[in-house]
């Protein structure tokens, strides 16, 4: 048996319940509509937060580096920026010395082997990419003189350039770094860094965290790299992504507008109104039987679903029902807005559209932009030559040869294959080597080319059997060269010879 309780609609309790219900339904509807139109729109970082980061980049170095890694994955322009930094340098190098000694060839051979052993090309590309991402990088050469190897510290928060001594940076390690690791990981790391950071250093730190917190790294083995600094004594640099982040965020907002428009189209709702107050009020919604309303709703829904799948469908509804479709404007943003913001991003990173994807500009502007970008990378490579590999050379060479040898990477834009071949062929015409010409021909081996040439000249003697076609310059029977005039008393011959007319024609 059902018991019905009469509710006093004037009571405060009823009004409170009604207010809570209205609030709930309003919140639900608002959230539902909001989710419909914001689907696929991700909130990343606000411009105000960027302002805080950029106003104190040293304090927020880690956050800026994390942003660089995030946008490297999510943003095409930033991804391409780092890929070009890594891929463009050819990393061809030369080793030279200030003072030539008898053992120079032996020393240069040793340095070449050392560079090959440490995989210098992979190491250099990693250093370029990491220092451009973080702005600052610190590494150290571990091992002995016979087998040195690099170790790169990934967290600038704990390992950083602290001050200069005798003009060179002194890098320090915050011993808090080792508290992050488990015992076995920490022991292995300390073992690798020994004798420069030992287990006893960590134990002393755990006893007195203030006194033994910072440990200096040896200058002769440590290499700090920085980029994006405005002062010589500025220890921490800035990431290459920072100049364009405001424009990247602005472009994302434009894309969010496009997504919102797309969501409105996708989630467009047709409104079916059943009932009317016209006439005598017999067909108002409240007076219509539930079965009638369900039948009308079901018929319209089935027709719309079939229309979406198979095309046009006809549905009939009574005159007391009405169906309305929303007028959704599908016009998005003007493409010129995206062109403008793309140009701003490219300018911020020093990359033209023609260099990134071949869009816009011409060959001349793209070539000029590429030259400029090579110069920017070249500055980083100069630091790598001096800070990284110069210290490697000093480790593997005898003490008497310290700072005598140095390396130079090719930092300019490389020649095209055609330009290189033209130069090599001209040199070969003057009697220089043909080997480098053959080496630049794809699919042609120098050994097989040389073997075939010797076979044709020495065994088949083709040069004696096959003569070049004769021309008007060589068509003089068995004689070669320009024909000689037999009658030297001819007036024209005498005149030409005395005035040197053949060499200086009028």
Swiss-Prot record:
Residues of the region (Disordered) are 473-506
Point to the regions of Polar residues compositional bias. 486-506
Specify the superkingdom.
Bacteria
The molecule here is called: SPbeta prophage-derived uncharacterized protein YonE
Question: Which species is the source of this protein?
Answer: Bacillus subtilis (strain 168)
Q: Please spell out the taxonomic lineage of the organism that makes this protein.
A: Bacteria, Bacillati, Bacillota, Bacilli, Bacillales
